[in-house]
């Protein structure tokens, strides 16, 4: 098991607990009468998440290569995505299932299930010359999930899922033309967010989604409306400066910054601990992502390689979208920051992703050892064959020498006689 990945995962999770408690204490005290409410819940998710990650790392071989199980899990996911439409909406979206203990968000689990499916089918059809066969299953599964999630509506999850699957597909060996067209499509998609307000308001989006687009363009146009959250995030970062105001001394979390303990947790880190700590946190987070990419390039097993690449891309895209929204570089879509933001479904999914990487690296090590053993066995067989050939040659030489000696003896007897 890769200790570096596991240690960084635990370190970020522990830091996340500290910041969730600090960012949520005021809100939880005023809403439920207990300042530790969100801390206790997140602590339970962290303990469960670490256990799940280690469990997957040690037992993944039992189910990751089972295609029937993959299909069953995917069907269950689709049923859950359909079931959410029977639930009451939260903040304008029907994305959660109320389980009494916590709210389950099936669309979050779609990310790791699609990574699993991609790694499985890209490895299965690695020798296929038909690109349709190679991409049919992963892209078809993604398309159905994206349609259902978009209907909730949850544009942020769809954006991350599509971008993640597109980038993972590029690693399978797209042609230069396909890469060029994909790049053009990405640029067009990003420029789409800069459409004039007069056009955006007529597109089939909910009112709050249109508001997020508008605040992304210029939050200062409506400081008390759609631009309010972005501006409060900016103020939190500005107030913290380089060194921060001190842990638990945030003003923005006291009712000014919405979702301070979830989507905008990094703003509170900046306000209380300063830009230097924000920078260190991001360095650790992106070191983890780059380390996963680095380990992926040495994987001999294609399944392990695609699993690592998929998780690395997922963490990179999700982190980028969250940070981009905070800095005003992307629309606010309610995307949490991996390992740091409050949220049961989000943290468990991130834990599953880490478990998948730990398993992939462990399995690849076994896979490489198996290859080495086969090479040694083949070399041993070749050596045995060579020894047999040598022994046969020696026997032939001995017989030849004996025949020569016998002939010489006979010759001596004849001449002597």
Question: Model-derived features: where do they sit?
Answer:
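Alpha-helical transmembrane segments of multi-pass membrane proteins
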Residues: 11-25
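N-terminal membrane topogenic signal
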Residues: 1-9
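Hydrophobic, glycine- and aromatic-enriched re-entrant/interface helices and adjoining loop segments
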Residues: 182-277
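Loop-to-helix entry and N-terminal half of a specific, functionally important transmembrane alpha helix
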Residues: 294-333
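Hydrophobic alpha-helical transmembrane segments
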Residues: 44-52, 272-292
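Short, highly charged, low-complexity non-transmembrane loops/tails of multi-pass membrane proteins
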Residues: 212, 367-405
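Membrane-helix boundary/helix-loop-helix interface segments in multi-pass membrane proteins
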Residues: 3-4, 26-152, 323, 327-333, ...
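Hydrophobic alpha-helical segments of polytopic membrane proteins
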Residues: 69-70, 74-78, 135-148, 155-201
């Amino acid at each position: 098991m890769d200790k570096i990945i596991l240690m960084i995962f635990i370190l970020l999770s522990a830091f996340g607990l500290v910041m969730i408690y600090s960012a949520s204490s005021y809100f939880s005290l005023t809403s439920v009468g207990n300042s530790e409410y969100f801390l206790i819940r997140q602590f339970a998710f962290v303990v469960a998440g670490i256990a799940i990650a280690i469990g997957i790392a040690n037992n993944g071989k039992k189910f990751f290569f089972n295609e029937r199980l993959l299909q069953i899990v995917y069907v269950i996911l689709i049923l859950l995505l359909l079931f959410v439409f029977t639930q009451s909406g939260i903040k304008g979206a029907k994305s959660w299932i109320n389980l009494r203990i916590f709210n389950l968000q099936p669309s979050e689990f779609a990310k790791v299930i699609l990574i699993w499916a991609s790694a499985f089918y890209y490895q299965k059809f690695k020798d296929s010359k038909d690109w349709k066969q190679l991409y049919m299953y992963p892209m078809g599964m993604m398309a159905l999930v994206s349609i259902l999630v978009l209907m909730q509506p949850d544009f942020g999850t769809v954006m991350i899922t599509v971008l993640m699957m597109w980038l993972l597909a590029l690693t399978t060996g797209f042609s230069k033309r396909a890469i060029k067209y994909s790049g053009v499509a990405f640029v067009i998609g990003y420029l789409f967010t800069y459409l004039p307000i007069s056009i955006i308001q007529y597109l089939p989006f909910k009112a709050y989604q249109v508001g997020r687009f508008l605040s992304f363009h210029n939050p200062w146009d409506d400081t008390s409306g759609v631009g309010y959250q972005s501006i409060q995030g900016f103020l939190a970062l500005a107030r913290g400066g380089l060194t921060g105001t001190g842990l638990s001394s945030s003003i923005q979390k006291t009712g000014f910054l919405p979702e301070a303990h979830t989507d905008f947790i990094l703003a509170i880190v900046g306000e209380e601990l300063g830009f230097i700590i924000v920078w260190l946190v991001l360095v650790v987070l992106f070191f983890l992502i780059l380390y996963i990419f680095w380990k992926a390039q040495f994987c001999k097993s294609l399944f392990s390689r695609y699993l690592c690449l998929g998780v690395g891309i997922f963490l990179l895209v999700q982190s980028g979208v969250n940070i981009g929204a905070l800095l005003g570089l992307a629309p606010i879509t309610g995307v949490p920051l991996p390992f740091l933001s409050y949220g049961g479904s989000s943290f468990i999914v991130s834990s599953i992703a880490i478990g998948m990487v730990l398993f992939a690296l462990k399995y690849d090590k076994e896979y490489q050892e198996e290859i080495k053993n086969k090479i040694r066995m083949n070399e041993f067989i070749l050596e045995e064959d060579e020894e047999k050939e040598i022994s046969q040659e020696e026997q032939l030489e001995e017989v030849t020498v004996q025949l020569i000696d016998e002939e010489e003896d006979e010759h001596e007897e004849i001449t002597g006689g």
